[in-house]
Structures are given as C-alpha cells and as structure tokens.
C-alpha cells in the first residue's frame, strides 16, 4: 500500500521512503484476492512460480482496427504479477502484442513467460522460497 520511487539501482541499505496510497489491511486483502488468479481454477495458472506464492492479474484487449472500431483478430495479452505475494520483492508485467496461434488470453500467452522470468529473477535475487516456511501451503503442494 506504499508507493515508492522506481529505480534500477540498488542503494545498499538506504531506506527509501514512499507515501501510503492504501491502508495496509486493504493492500493485504487485494494481494490475497490476486493470489487466486494463479491457483487452480484461476485465469492464469500457468503464471505460477514453483515454491512461491504469486499475486497477479491477467489482461486481454482487442486492438484498434485501422478502419475504426476494434479488430476481431488482433489482441494484446498481458499478465502483471508480484512475488512473493505476502512480502513482495519483485513486480513484473509481461505483454505480448498480437500473439500468434489460437490462444490470445493473457493467462495463456503471457502467464508462462512471467512464470519462467520471475522464477529466474527470484533465484538471482536470492529470495527465500515460501515453501521453506512451515505454515505456508502452496496450491502446487496439495493438501496434506
């Protein structure tokens, strides 16, 4: 619920101040809702990242047609997500312009790209997996 200035540079241990735009409980509730998107039955199960809980949103839009209105066969597909959902370290948006083939929905087209890229980014950043926390059960682990 806090907006912080974006940067590509790591500033050591310097604390970056932001401004609160959502109260903490509302932000937590929205993140919890967005985790359902990548769980079984959600619209972006292919965006899931092994051993991490992901929160995200899919998007699919028709592109504007040259002759006016919207094209029936040209789309933009996207998936925007963050991980780990309970304490986000990384946020990412994957957009695919005019996906080819029969699938054009964000969860099916951009979701797998998000999954692979986020998985590598979390590994490179040494973000501890959720699976190592004893009180967290991931959808991929099933019920014990």
Place the predicted regions along the sequence by residue:
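Short, Gly/Ser/Thr-enriched beta-strand-loop segments that form substrate-interacting elements
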Residues: 50-83
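Generic beta-strand/beta-sheet core signal
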Residues: 6-7, 55, 59, 83, ...
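Short alpha-helix boundary/capping segments
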Residues: 22, 72, 102-113
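Residue-level preference for non-acidic, small/hydrophobic
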Residues: 30, 57-59, 80, 92, ...
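Extracytoplasmic/secreted envelope proteins and their assembly/folding machinery
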Residues: 27-34, 77, 111, 115-119
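Conserved active-site-proximal loop/helix segments of enzymes involved in bacterial cell-wall
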Residues: 1-51, 101-104, 124-144
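Solvent-exposed loop/turn segments at secondary-structure junctions
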Residues: 37, 60-62, 85-87, 97-101
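Short, well-ordered beta-strand elements
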Residues: 79-80, 88-104
């Amino acid at each position: 619920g806090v907006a912080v200035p974006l940067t590509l540079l790591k500033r050591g241990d310097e604390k970056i101040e932001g401004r609160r735009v959502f109260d903490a409980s509302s932000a937590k509730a929205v993140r919890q809702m967005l985790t359902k998107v990548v769980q079984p039955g959600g619209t972006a199960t292919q965006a899931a990242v092994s051993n991490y809980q992901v929160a995200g949103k899919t998007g699919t839009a028709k592109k504007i047609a040259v002759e006016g209105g919207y094209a029936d066969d040209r789309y933009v597909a996207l998936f925007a997500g963050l991980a780990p959902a309970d304490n986000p370290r990384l946020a990412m948006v994957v957009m695919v312009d005019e996906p080819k083939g029969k699938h054009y929905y964000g969860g099916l087209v951009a979701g797998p790209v998000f999954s692979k890229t986020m998985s590598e980014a979390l590994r490179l950043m040494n973000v501890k997996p959720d699976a190592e926390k004893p009180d967290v059960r991931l959808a991929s682990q099933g019920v014990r």
